[in-house]
Amino acid sequence: LPGRRRMSIRLSAVTSIRNEEARLAACLEHVAFADQIVVVMDRCTDGSRAIAERFGAKIIEGAWDIEGDRRNAAIQACDGEWILEVDADEHVTEALAAEIRQVIENSGSDWHEILVDNFIGERRVRYGWGASYGKAAYPGLFRKGVKTWGRQRVHPRLKWSGAKGPMLKNRVNHYVDRGVSDMIRRLDNYSSARARDMRETGEIGSTANNVRRLFSRFIKCYIGRKGYREGGYGLLIALFAGLYPIISHIKAKLEDD
């Protein structure tokens, strides 16, 4: 934050965005406990910059086609010893904020996973997430220098150079979708980005294998991760998690971009 010496920064909270003026203020309000807020703005044309400035954030502007590259730029922009990585649709609760402060003062490890409570609209949907369609936890708290994102457009792979610590007990609130239409749009966006990665690497795979994954992922999310407990939303989560690989595969085979 302005006026604070760089050496005093223990914790940086960082988010990377593209035109998130509708959600950014609420996100930043929930990370105001950090010593530094960093906002990486990817080709933003809305009012996001003014919002970030209001919170005294360190702002990095640029253009990134690869999600992993953008996230790595965000990490590099942080001055803190520890980094808390959040998305614009995520809110850090007061209990989680207090736990994070305690962990960074006492942890002998290099990174920790954070549990996630996902919301569709105003409804909390806790069960069924995973298999590249949603997250139940993520490695969001880490020392600078131990986490590197891979060069993928969607769901970049991670490379670690440090020791994993215990999972945090409190959860971040993730307002992932407003409703079913958002869920469908997200599946379309994810599969398009994944198809581009597959074409570039030549790793398109076989139709038969991706059909098999449709069923295995559905069973994993609906039965193994108890999506059945969430009613219709749980059914859709499992269905979309299963469809994601086969739709990505077909797009990679049939479409140029």
List each language-model region with its residue ranges:
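Short, Lys/Arg-enriched N-terminal segments with co-localized hydrophobic residues
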Residues: 1-6
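Cell-envelope/extracellular polymer assembly enzymes that use nucleotide-activated donors
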Residues: 10-12, 36
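Acidic helix N-cap motif at the loop->helix transition within catalytic regions
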Residues: 22-25, 46-55, 95-96
